[in-house]
Design a protein with these regions (language model features):
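Hydrophobic alpha-helical membrane segments
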Residues: 1-176
């Protein structure tokens, strides 16, 4: 999805479905392995946090704080790993490494994107159940794509720093 939304932000692609399925096909194997790794890490973080919650007062609090930091780092990597996969050709190891380094290096953008991802939770604070259900339905239909599109504006700015500029043919000197 990020492959298409980043192209949309740059006004580069006219065929949304064709581009989506092309990128899906190209990245399927790596994305599946990344999904499994991220799932395993999420389960381990969840289990460790629960175990820390059942420990003694001081030790449990310290471990919960440590796992909260690891969870934040996990979410930051999760935010970047799929856009990095969609934009760059890397090994899985380098995709994770680059996602982590970019998330840390561009911390203000990272936190803005996290806020964008968390904003839909505001739906649950709307007092009317009927409005909540309508908004939840809209979010299920359009939410992930809208969030990806909004975050893609930031990813384009971030990734442009890592992509070498091609010389403009008009600016290049013609040798006689």
């Amino acid at each position: 999805m990020y492959y298409v939304t980043m192209k949309m932000v740059r006004n580069e692609e006219a065929y949304i479905f064709r581009s989506f399925f092309k990128s899906f096909k190209e990245n399927f194997k790596q994305a599946t392995i990344i999904n499994v790794i991220m799932l395993i890490v999420a389960v381990l973080l969840y289990l460790d946090t629960n175990i820390a919650g059942n420990m003694g007062q001081t030790t449990g609090k310290i471990l919960r704080m440590i796992f909260a930091v690891f969870t934040l780092l996990y979410v930051m990597v999760l935010l970047y790993v799929y856009p990095v996969l969609a934009k760059f050709y890397n090994s899985i190891k380098n995709t994770f490494k680059n996602a982590f380094l970019m998330a840390i290096r561009h911390l203000p953008f990272t936190f803005l994107m996290l806020v964008i991802c968390v904003c839909p939770l505001a739906i649950f604070f709307i007092p009317s159940f009927q409005i909540q259900m309508s908004l939840i339905l809209l979010f299920i239909l359009f939410g992930p794509a809208v969030i990806a599109y909004a975050n893609s504006h930031f990813f384009v700015k971030i990734f442009d720093r890592y992509i070498p500029k091609e010389p403009d043919p008009e600016e290049a000197e013609v040798m006689p």
